[in-house]
Amino acid sequence: MHGKLLPLAGLYLVQGLPYGLQSSLLPILLRARGLSLTRVGLTKGLYAPWLLKLAWAPLVDRRGTPRVWLTFSTVCLGLVCGLLAVLPPPQAGQTGLPTTVMGLLLLLNLGAAVQDVALDTLAVQLLEPKELGPGNTVQVVAYKLGSALAGGGLLVFFPTLSWPLLFLLLTATYWLAAALAWAAPALGRLSRPQVSEHTPHTSYLLQDLLAVPGTLWTAGFVLTYKMGEQGAGSLFPLLLLDHGASASDLGLWSGLGAATCSIAGSSLGGALLARHCSHPRQPLKLLRSVLQLRLGGLACQTALLLHLNTPGASLDPGTVMRGAALLSLCLQQFLGGVVTTATFTVMMHCSQLAPRALQATHYSFLATLELLGKLLPGTLAGVLADGLGPRLCFAAFLVLSALPVLDLRLAPSNLT
């Protein structure tokens, strides 16, 4: 089993790099160079290729092998990072990212989305039923670790680590990962998948997906359960930067510290569900408790933000406000990790109610909605903050975080 899990761990770690780069590192660097919250937030629109995974997933499934697609996409990611290394970084006073840089970041997300489909397909084919538990743990932990290394980890070394050196380092990492994907013995033993003789017609696919019991409720829940958390999580570090926190400190706490807490939360959620997995209601019961705690944590974070605007409030080293703000970042990530693990378990349970031939597509459909629910608030948070001000913006995030708590009362009986 170690011969399978070790290469998967390395590949999932590499898969988390683009997310950490664009969710943690770039926003703080761009804000430090004077870009508005609106423009910083809108750069997350570059995640758009991730929402189109269902468009090329059939191609990855039917043409070639997952190993070929995985190697090809990883090599392309290294090439894009190499091109980014030769371009000048965003300069202070610019109104936004240069068009060429935006285009390459869009290609980076396209390659990462193709890599995601290929790697998930490979994991499904590679792992035996008894290996799914350890395999899923490796997936979550390695992905979040890669995100932390590319986000907070690299940010800690700025400005020592220059823009060209950053992307040259990522280029070397991607090409090493591509060599790993091609040379790993366990991955080389996979055979070419057989193409199914029956392919659902596109016009009926959505109808078939929505006909699965519990899908409408699950789709609505996964679309909304992260909106408040994601909006606040993307905006709060930038506001701390505006109030005097250093970029390196935020990289350490918002990146590495928060990612460590998120991994711990995901691990705790998995352990709790594994201990009580015999009853399908357990994920919903866990969600009900943790979502209420998350709502309380966001209320405290909002109160901290309001207090920072009062005379005499400071984020200087050694102050209570500084410790409370950094603790708030980590606490929300920890609770968010538990919530994510429980929610993905609910998604899997719902997809298992679908016909076997539709289960993979059904799960991809729910995962795409889950991603959309995280991207929208992260992208629009800056626009809301610039237009409404941080106070009203965080009040809206509180309302959005309360909706999933109420939504759980409407869960259908086939999921409870």
From Swiss-Prot:
Keywords: Membrane, Transmembrane, Transmembrane helix, Transport. The chain crosses the membrane at residues 10-30, 40-60, 68-88, 99-119, 139-158, 170-190, 204-224, 252-272, 295-315, 324-344, 365-385, 392-412. The keyword Iron does not apply. It is found in: Membrane. This is Major facilitator superfamily domain-containing protein 3. Its main location: membrane. GO terms for cellular component: membrane. It comes from the Eukaryota. Belongs to the major facilitator superfamily. It comes from Rattus norvegicus (Rat). The keyword Nucleus does not apply. It is a multi-pass membrane protein.
